[in-house]
């Protein structure tokens, strides 16, 4: 991203974008306390400031940078103007002031950010591996299981719930093996909620919702499921 502004407003906009970019990273990481700024001491001759957003808990030595935020001043447009012969000054229509816009540049890498998101979320516990992704970025928000796949009445109700939820959320379906293995399979891919339809569900119209991180189980009314998931994703 390149943000063009008045030279006198560079400080304001540099700090603005520095804050905005860090806030975005913190909004998607599981442990935002693992993020920080690195201020460059050696700068290009045209630069006044340069910061990197880093994953400070990285085990990769110096490979911590996810995004750079740079004060480029008027260097880019001045050089373009010099070599192209084009006047790239901006004229303020209200004041008539003429100036070369200054540039705040932010540049990030998707591959390294993805790597650090995985490192930040990965956990090995005594009896399971769990990817504790921020629910906002989990590939699936929920998974629906019939307690027993060979019971048509359970499968029918579970499939109905699955069809309803997938309208608004990325939802997985799994009826393989036993329920414990299904839970752990979803833990490994970071699914925040597992929803189990059991025999009680046929009577009380409620399902068991298991949270990925706490493994706590709650009974939630079927007609309240969508709102429950939405609330916990906010």
Which residue stretches match the model-derived regions?
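NTP/phosphate- and nucleic-acid-binding module
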Residues: 2-234
